[in-house]
Amino acid sequence: MKLIREEIENVEVIVEERGGKKNLYIEGVFLQGDIKNRNGRMYPCGTLAKEVSRYNEAFITKGRALGELGHPDGPTVNLDRVSHKITSLRQEGSDFIGRAKILSTPMGNIAKSLLGEGVKLGVSSRGVGSVAMNNDCLLYTSPSPRDTAI
């Protein structure tokens, strides 16, 4: 088993206002299946769909789908670095579209400031799994343990 990370850079910034309070969200492709990514890996769409379903049930629906600012070295979320909470993750073809609320934490405030200044932030997913060589790419072969983060 090894740490597996994937980064996607095209996300949209959305500002929603409710009751005079503004909330900042990012939305876009969080995961992609059945294509070779720039890290030379391919994740079968069926495996991603199963893991996303499990992640939705275990984390998103319970308000526990937290993420960090930056690229952590391990598969678990460090609460002192939390910047966002994933509010939805759904499949559209071989893409998995996510939406995350930027939180009012120290790291969330840094993310808000960067986005406000026009910095383009991306989404990085990580987990622990196994990979095997398949033609010209590494094929993800086994699911992550329970504490995978997006």
Question: What would you call each of these model-derived segments?
Answer:
Residues M1-N56:
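Polar/acidic, low-complexity leader/linker segments enriched in S/T/G and N/D
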Residues F30-D34, H71-D73, I102:
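Short glycine-rich, polar/acidic loop-and-turn segments at beta strand-coil junctions
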